[in-house]
UniProtKB/Swiss-Prot annotation:
Its cofactor is pyridoxal 5'-phosphate. PANTHER family: ALANINE RACEMASE (PTHR30511), ALANINE RACEMASE, CATABOLIC-RELATED (PTHR30511:SF0). Keywords: Isomerase, Pyridoxal phosphate. Pathway: Amino-acid biosynthesis; D-alanine biosynthesis; D-alanine from L-alanine: step 1/1. This is Alanine racemase. The active site is at 39 (proton acceptor), 265 (proton acceptor). It comes from the Bacteria. It comes from Geobacillus kaustophilus (strain HTA426). SUPFAM superfamilies: Alanine racemase C-terminal domain-like, PLP-binding barrel. Signal peptide: none annotated.
Length: 384
């Protein structure tokens, strides 16, 4: 296990991730596969640790954003099928084939170049991305779709393993655009001479709300980590999700301020009475952003406001009473009856819950818990 020497850390509850995947496994129609989405270091939770847990809980495949993320999982011993959801270079097809990594394809000219560069015999699997209304990646034209299918068919090492699309509004209460995209996908599937083995369109929101329209695989991302795809549909979810990510620190200094004394850069906070101020070693360089000034944390089971501007490596909080150095501070998570959720942080920042754990950076070690015990400690600082 890695060591760390700053009293700020993330705790990842792998039991929660296991339960979220296992609950989805039970909820989905029989025969529906789960592709666990572990891009962006598993949304800040730890890619290999989450991948292994998800596979154990019933996922059969993994998805990442780009090839480097897939290769990193292979180096960490993850052997399950992996799909790269984003764009890849045609020059890297051989590398993907060598490591049994499936690539997303959506352009015939890309595929022509890849076929001219790849002279190997090892099969390379592709998933065709269709743009049904997201406007990001994906083929939209029938003739282009048929060209891609024909190119794959003419190049024997190439295998069309799957076809998919992505919903733009499955996390909204209004389902009009979702229904439009779904109908569009059904229509576009008929452009192919035959359907490949895997057909997938459902993200977390669609998998949990419209499991009858999931084809034979779903991509389970945000809700694997215990987070609702949006606050609006949280009451509509079929079962309770278990949040896996919590963030903690400790008081490293406690001081008493007199009325009129100031705190932090810009002297934007002024003590109104005698106040106890605590310093904790986390700042915007760790992803605890300056906009979280005036937010609160938990200390001694009570809420304590963040006062003054958040610094690069530290921030200050107003304590309810004098507390000893070393007292635990919870920035995300539970203390006693009080809870600060990722959704609470996202609401204060005016963003979505996805962004919060992704933003907590590499300087903050991750402690992984499984079966209520520490399984691993991972500190990325100093790792080459």
């Amino acid at each position: 296990m890695d060591e760390f020497h700053r009293d700020t850390w993330v705790e990842i509850d792998l039991d929660a991730i296991y339960d979220n995947v296992a609950n989805l496994r039970r909820f989905l129609p029989e025969g529906t596969q789960i592709m666990a989405v572990v891009k962006a270091n598993a949304y800040g939770h730890g890619d290999a640790q989450v991948a292994a847990t998800a596979l154990e809980a019933g996922a059969s495949r993994l998805a990442v954003a780009f090839l480097d993320e897939a290769l990193a999982l292979r180096k960490k011993g993850i052997d399950a099928p992996i799909l790269v959801l984003g764009a890849s270079r045609p020059e890297d097809v051989a590398l993907a084939a060598e490591h049994r990594i499936a690539l997303t394809v959506f352009r015939s000219d890309w595929l022509e170049k890849a076929s001219s560069l790849y002279n190997g015999s090892t099969p390379i699997h592709f998933h065709l991305k269709m743009d049904t209304g997201m406007g990001r990646l994906g083929v939209k034209d029938e003739e282009e779709t048929k060209r891609i299918a024909a190119l794959i068919d003419r190049h024997p090492p190439f295998v069309l393993e799957g076809v998919y699309t992505h919903f733009a509004t499955a996390d909204e209460v209004n389902t009009d655009y979702f229904s439009y995209q779904y109908a569009r996908f059904l229509h576009m599937l008929d452009w192919l001479p035959s359907r490949p083995p895997l057909v997938h369109c459902a993200n977390s929101a669609a998998a949990l709300r419209f499991s009858d329209r999931a084809f034979n695989m779903v991509r389970f991302g945000i809700s694997m980590y215990g987070l609702a795809p949006s606050p609006d549909i949280k009451p509509l979810l079929p079962y309770e999700l278990k949040e896996a990510f919590s963030l903690h620190s400790r008081l490293v200094h406690v001081k008493k301020l007199q009325p009129g004394e100031k705190v932090s850069y810009g002297a934007t906070y002024t003590a109104q009475t005698e106040e106890w101020i605590g310093t904790i070693p986390i700042g915007y360089a760790d992803g605890w952003l300056r906009r979280l000034q005036h937010f609160h944390v938990l200390v001694g089971g009570q809420r304590a406001p963040i006062v003054g501007r958040i610094c690069m490596d530290q921030c200050m909080i107003r304590l309810p009473e004098p507390l000893p150095v070393g007292t635990k501070v919870t920035l995300i998570g539970r203390q006693g009856d009080e809870v600060i959720s990722i959704d609470d942080v996202a609401r204060h920042l005016g963003t979505i819950n996805y962004e919060v754990p992704c933003t907590i950076g590499y300087r903050v070690p991750r402690i992984f818990f499984r079966n209520k015990r520490i399984m691993e400690v991972r500190n990325a600082v100093g790792r080459g």
